[in-house]
A protein has these predicted regions:
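Catalytic Walker B motif of ABC-type/P-loop ATPase nucleotide-binding domains
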Residues: 158-162
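The feature captures the beta-strand-to-loop junction immediately N-terminal to the Walker
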Residues: 33-35
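Conserved ABC transporter NBD signature motif
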Residues: 56-64, 73
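ABC ATPase nucleotide-binding domains
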Residues: 230-247
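Conserved ABC ATPase signature
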Residues: 108, 133-137
Length: 247
């Protein structure tokens, strides 16, 4: 379990997160939704240490992750940003980068590292492209390769920033089913979602973020009943989690 308590973070003098508290449980997929500029991406960056936190704590086991180095934190948390580079390397080479937090410099991969990387590629369905250039993959398969990189870190928790962006609906659904499967295997998954209906259909819990604060947290059914979607987004959701389209 990952407990985030009263986390305050931002950029220089500009505060973006104002005392965020959230619990991420193993075996659950938690989605963060909210308007643009509400602090969704900043929340993930603050958890992994890319954005500095001015106060609060992030507890895993008996340790406050804020006291750990970025590398030590990467042994516990995998992070996939929304904007990703396209390195000039094979899928296998990129996925092996997920082992970096676990190996010393100069980096030499062990048989165990290669085994873990292969298992990650197999789980995400990209092992048949292992020696292909990453740039040769379709958008959906490329995203699966990036997720394999995260899995190769061998962490309990995955933090994903809008992982379905730029994917067509078929690949969006395929990716969300894979995330559900990973959660059911015991991983805790925290994902920023732009698509409210995907969040409602695939999440165990949803945190609604607005103005740097969590204004509602609960199951998809609780979110739907609360009316918070109408309040925050000015849209209405049907009982089947589809959007009500105004004509």
């Amino acid at each position: 379990m990952l407990e985030i308590n009263n986390l305050v973070a931002g950029y220089g003098e500009r505060r973006v997160l104002s005392g965020i508290s959230l619990t991420l449980k193993n075996g659950e997929l938690t989605s963060v939704i909210g308007p643009n500029g509400s602090g969704k991406s900043t929340l993930l960056k603050a958890i992994i240490g890319v954005v500095q936190s001015s106060s609060g704590e992030i507890i895993s086991g008996d340790r406050n992750l804020l006291s750990l180095s970025y590398r030590e934190r990467a042994k516990k948390l995998s992070y996939l940003p929304q904007g990703k580079p396209l390195p000039d390397m094979s899928v296998r080479q990129m996925v092996l980068h997920g082992r970096f937090p676990h190996i010393e410099y100069p980096r030499k991969y062990t048989a165990r590292d290669r085994e873990i990387a292969l298992g990650a590629m197999q789980k995400m369905g990209v092992d048949s492209f292992a020696d292909s250039p990453l740039s040769s993959l379709s958008g959906g398969m490329r995203q699966n390769a990036y997720l394999a990189l995260c899995l190769a870190q061998d962490t309990e928790f995955l933090l994903l920033d809008e992982p379905t962006t730029y994917l067509d609906i078929k690949n969006q659904l395929s990716l969300m089913r894979r995330l559900r499967s990973l959660a059911e295997e015991g991983r805790g998954i925290l994902t920023v979602m732009h698509d409210i209906t995907l969040a409602l259909n695939f999440s165990d819990k949803i945190a609604v973020l607005s103005g740097g604060n969590i204004v509602f947290y609960g199951t998809p059914q609780e979110v739907l009943k609360s009316g918070i979607i109408k309040t925050v987004f000015d849209v209405e959701i049907n009982n089947d989690y589809s959007l009500k389209i105004k004509k």
